[in-house]
């Protein structure tokens, strides 16, 4: 019987998690496995993810791929996989409970540092910026913000006018940016912890009637952000490759179920995407290449 893998992602609105689901499906098809997706209807909702864990436990998958909606609030539910003897594979954002077999992700602090430095160099190392943070409940948000501040320490003439919580969600980011009291359209640049928020900053600025856009960067290299780079509305994005993370985590699960040893951690490199190289990413998620197991494990 083909391995059955339960895949938990945080929401249905962030394109990064759409990419993760695509990655799991592509890998499962190639490896003769099957995946079932468990996604809260309300984005990042703790109670719903706990309910989904209980549903999955009743369906007895062979392995679980898991992205926690909160760093600690779903820990008791995660431990239920251990109690049921179901191996846990973690991707994108680290779990803080459970006997994780393997984590697949990237260095979010380095990613934040690199995309911030790219932005600061573009505005010649001086000016006023706004920061759009993710959700405090996510370690990726905390680490990216730390990377942003590492970069700020290197550029003393960059001043942060405001740092807003966009919760990694497009509607929240737009509202936060629109309601900011001190003329957000007048900053020189906007540093966003993901593309989903960066795109709503663009929408908010359009609604405010901004005559000139600030320089904007994001993270994830989602297709809509690549289109914005192509038209000059965004400067750059960091390719935090959730599709590859999920595909590699799926393969790790299948290999483990087949009796192979797998690394406890697999870290994927991150590349800055801008007007010089965006063409490689200028396609839908399912048309993008995924790195192979041997390419990432042998690095």
Go through the PLM ranges and name each one.
Residues 71-110, 118-121, 128, 220-235:
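Flexible loop/hinge segments that line or gate small-molecule binding clefts
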Residues 188-189, 202-243, 247-251, 255-267, ...:
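Exported/periplasmic ABC-transporter solute-binding proteins
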Residues 8-22, 37-48, 70, 93, ...:
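Hinge/beta->alpha junction and helix N-cap segments in small-molecule ligand-binding domains
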Residues 57-82, 148, 160-162, 166-228:
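Hydrophobic alpha-helical
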Residues 1, 136-139, 151-152, 244-299:
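Hinge/cleft segment of the Venus flytrap/periplasmic-binding protein
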Residues 57, 119-124, 181, 249, ...:
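Short, hydrophobic alpha-helical segments
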Residues 3-4, 33, 123-129, 214:
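Nucleotide donor/acceptor-binding cores
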């Amino acid at each position: 019987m083909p391995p059955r893998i339960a895949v938990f992602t945080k929401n249905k609105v962030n394109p990064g998690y759409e990419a993760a689901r695509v990655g799991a499906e592509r890998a499962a098809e190639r490896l003769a496995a099957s995946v079932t997706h468990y996604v809260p209807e309300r984005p990042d909702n703790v109670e719903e993810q706990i309910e989904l864990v209980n549903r999955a436990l009743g369906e007895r998958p062979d392995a679980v791929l898991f992205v926690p909606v909160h760093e600690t609030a779903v820990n008791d539910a995660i431990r239920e996989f251990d109690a049921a003897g179901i191996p846990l594979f973690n991707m994108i954002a680290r779990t803080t409970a459970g006997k994780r077999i393997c984590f697949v992700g990237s260095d979010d602090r380095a990613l934040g540092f690199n995309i911030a430095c790219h932005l600061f160099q573009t505005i010649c190392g001086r000016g006023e910026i706004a920061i759009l943070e993710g959700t405090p409940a996510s370690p990726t948000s905390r680490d990216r913000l730390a990377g942003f501040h590492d970069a700020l320490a290197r550029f003393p003439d960059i001043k942060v006018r405001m740092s807003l919580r966009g919760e990694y969600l497009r509607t929240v980011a737009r509202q936060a940016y629109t309601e900011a009291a001190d003329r957000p359209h007048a900053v020189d640049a906007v540093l966003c912890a993901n593309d989903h928020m960066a795109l709503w900053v663009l929408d908010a600025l359009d609604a405010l009637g901004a005559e000139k856009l600030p320089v904007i960067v994001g993270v994830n290299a989602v297709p809509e952000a690549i289109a914005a780079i192509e038209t000059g509305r965004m400067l750059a994005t960091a390719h935090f490759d959730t599709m590859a993370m999920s595909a590699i985590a799926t393969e790790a699960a299948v290999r483990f179920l087949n009796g192979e040893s797998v690394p406890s951690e697999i870290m994927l490199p991150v590349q800055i995407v801008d007007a010089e190289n965006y063409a490689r990413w200028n396609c839908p998620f399912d048309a993008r290449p995924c790195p192979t197991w041997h390419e990432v494990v042998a690095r």
